[in-house]
């Protein structure tokens, strides 16, 4: 007998399916001993070439996603990787025994059908079954046909079900594959060589980010997961591989939101004997090529906004962009103190360690970045934020660097690469000073990389592309998780830590409250009638993404799954109490039927519930978080 699920409350549907499997085994038809299929054509090939296949014998195989019919005639929809086709089966053709087994097939079963191609009286291209075989038994039912799988958290966790139930999801990942293939073809045709470099590194340099830490037992050495591809690729330029690129995963121990995932796909390339101007030309041509090849057009639409990759991309310096959108001319600011003063005047937050160049970058992020909708190269960054880049000869306070923007997002980052080992050592020293001041994203000195530069690196241009953001734009996907097959998710049993695995973060000590020092607001004297109260719609929601709202010190923007299949946006002024990344994956309570309220130009649709009290004169706030087993959309009574 097949071992059935032991948990209490197992559905009758699952029980019946296990019983069907037992019956198949007893009849000598165990589907799980079958190792192959005679499939010789895909369903879409038949449908796209009907005249060629009409009345011809074919063998198709795939998943059964619908069945209908009565008595001695059955119709079924069979799906394979290319699409679906209707199966027509008759008792008279298959015989009593085979037709009897076919009638016991369930939605989700994987089957093989041999027969001939024809059109029904309704004009639907179909396969008239002559032989049928069950290849694999589905023991758990798929989500109900018309509602499908809409719970966003569950879609990400069970992507295999998501791909079955939501064809548009599969289309997204087919396009992603084509995008990456198109990038490779373009670069290969331009004479670039694809390489692979280490993921486990002793020194995680090449970017400003917090790395993941691990320990290599065999060498008894602490290592890090790479945060960039840069430094090893530059070593290859030194070695004479003049045009190299890598497409690979990098890892940054940072927050999760609609555009960030801790592991993501990066493409970096380096080309000897060119500079950042050459990288601009390459970027423009590459984006145009990929869009045309994958989408058939150089005009793309994202979230209703049209962007034209066919026109020459705009080029603007960071200084000019800040002046244009903030009114502040940093050419007229000559000291760090002046920069801090104007930042205070404009309400731009900064840290005391920040210098003029850092503050210029903060101004760009605050005032200009959101306006970079059409393809735009923002050039000539301050040296303070560009430790691996060549200085501009005419103004050494700035470097030959650009960031490529679309839709207000940074899509790529490129340099005229620094190849002066003496200058590079000084930059590393400056980074180590920042590290000593508490900047855990600063780099340490990489002596082997300096040794490579001392051997001699030719003038080089380099660029890094975020593949995931590129896929978001070209597939019109709302969140980075929608273009990652298996995005990073908080484990459902994350509280059950395996023994012997060290935590990378200090255990949280539960805060003890002296309730004698707590003050709460008095209860209301006025009553609300039950009818009025019952009109408030309290729902459980899952936090898909959370990020700080630009230009606001208090607001967090939540992207929520409320069970409807459409993301809900709510803004809440709780940044003083929570960091965005710690709320992703939580289950919260909201009132959903409040009218939208515009906050910082964003419609907030509902209100998060929280508990507030005062303790020794300081306000404390706790969001109402509930058990993650409660599904999105569950109503509170």
What residues fall within each predicted segment?
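Short Gly/aromatic-enriched secondary-structure transition segments
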Residues: 78, 555-560
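Conserved RecA-like helicase motor-core motifs
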Residues: 569-570
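Class II aminoacyl-tRNA synthetase catalytic cores and aaRS-like
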Residues: 1-521, 525-526, 531-542, 564-566, ...
């Amino acid at each position: 007998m097949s071992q059935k699920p032991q948990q209490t409350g197992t559905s009758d549907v699952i029980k019946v399916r296990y019983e069907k499997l037992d019956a198949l085994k007893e009849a000598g038809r165990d589907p799980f001993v079958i190792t192959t299929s005679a499939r010789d054509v895909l369903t879409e090939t038949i449908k796209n070439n009907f005249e060629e296949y009409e009345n011809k014998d074919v063998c198709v195989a795939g998943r059964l996603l619908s069945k209908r019919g009565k008595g001695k005639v059955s119709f079924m929809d069979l799906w394979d990787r290319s699409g679906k086709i209707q199966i027509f089966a008759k008792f008279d053709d298959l015989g009593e025994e085979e037709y009897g087994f076919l009638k016991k097939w369930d939605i989700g079963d994987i089957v093989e059908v041999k027969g001939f191609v024809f059109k029904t009286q309704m004009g639907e291209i179909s396969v008239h079954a002559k032989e049928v075989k069950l290849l694999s038994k589905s023991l758990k039912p798929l989500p109900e046909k018309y509602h499908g799988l809409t719970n966003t958290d569950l879609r990400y966790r069970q992507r295999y079900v998501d791909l079955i139930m939501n064809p548009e999801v599969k289309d997204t990942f087919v396009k992603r594959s084509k995008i990456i293939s198109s990038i490779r073809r373009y670069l290969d045709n331009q004479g670039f060589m694809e390489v692979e470099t280490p993921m486990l590194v002793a020194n995680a340099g090449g970017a400003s980010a917090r790395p993941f830490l691990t320990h290599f037992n065999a060498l008894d050495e602490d290592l890090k997961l790479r945060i960039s591809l840069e430094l090893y690729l530059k070593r290859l330029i030194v070695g004479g591989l003049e045009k190299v690129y890598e497409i690979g995963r990098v890892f940054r121990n940072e927050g999760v939101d609609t555009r960030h995932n801790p592991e993501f796909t990066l493409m970096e390339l380096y080309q000897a004997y060119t500079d950042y101007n050459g990288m601009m030309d390459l970027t423009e041509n590459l984006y145009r090529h990929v869009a045309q090849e994958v989408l058939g057009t150089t005009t793309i639409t994202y979230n209703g906004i049209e962007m034209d990759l066919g026109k020459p991309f705009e080029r603007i310096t960071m200084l000019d962009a800040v002046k244009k959108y903030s009114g502040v001319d940093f050419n007229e600011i000559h000291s760090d103190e002046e920069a801090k003063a104007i930042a205070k005047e404009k309400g731009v937050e900064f840290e005391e360690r920040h210098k003029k160049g850092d503050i210029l970058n903060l101004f760009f992020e605050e005032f200009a970045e959101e306006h970079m909708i059409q393809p735009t190269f923002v050039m000539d960054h301050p040296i303070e934020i560009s430790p691996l880049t060549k200085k501009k000869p005419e103004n050494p306070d700035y470097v030959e660097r650009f960031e490529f923007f679309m839709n207000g997002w940074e899509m790529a980052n490129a340099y005229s690469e620094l190849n002066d080992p003496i200058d590079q050592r000084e930059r590393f020293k400056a980074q180590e000073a920042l590290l000593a001041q508490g900047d855990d994203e600063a780099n340490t000195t990489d002596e082997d990389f300096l040794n490579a530069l001392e051997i001699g690196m030719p003038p080089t241009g380099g660029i890094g592309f975020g593949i995931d953001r590129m896929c978001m734009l070209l597939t019109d996907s709302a969140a980075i998780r929608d273009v990652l097959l298996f995005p990073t998710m908080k484990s459902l049993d994350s509280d059950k830590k395996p023994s012997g695995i060290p935590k990378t973060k200090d255990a949280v000590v539960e805060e003890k409250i002296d309730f004698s020092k707590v003050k709460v607001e008095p209860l209301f004297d006025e009553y609300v009638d039950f009818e009025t109260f019952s009109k408030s719609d309290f729902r459980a929601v899952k936090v898909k993404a959370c990020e700080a709202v630009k230009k606001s010190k208090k607001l967090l923007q939540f992207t929520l799954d409320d069970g409807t299949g459409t993301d809900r946006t709510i803004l809440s002024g709780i940044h003083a109490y929570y960091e965005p990344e710690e709320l992703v994956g939580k289950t919260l309570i909201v009132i959903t039927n409040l009218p939208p309220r515009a906050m910082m130009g964003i419609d907030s649709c509902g209100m998060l519930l929280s508990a507030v009290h005062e303790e020794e004169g300081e306000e404390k706030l706790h969001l109402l978080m509930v058990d993650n087993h409660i599904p999105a959309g569950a109503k509170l009574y």
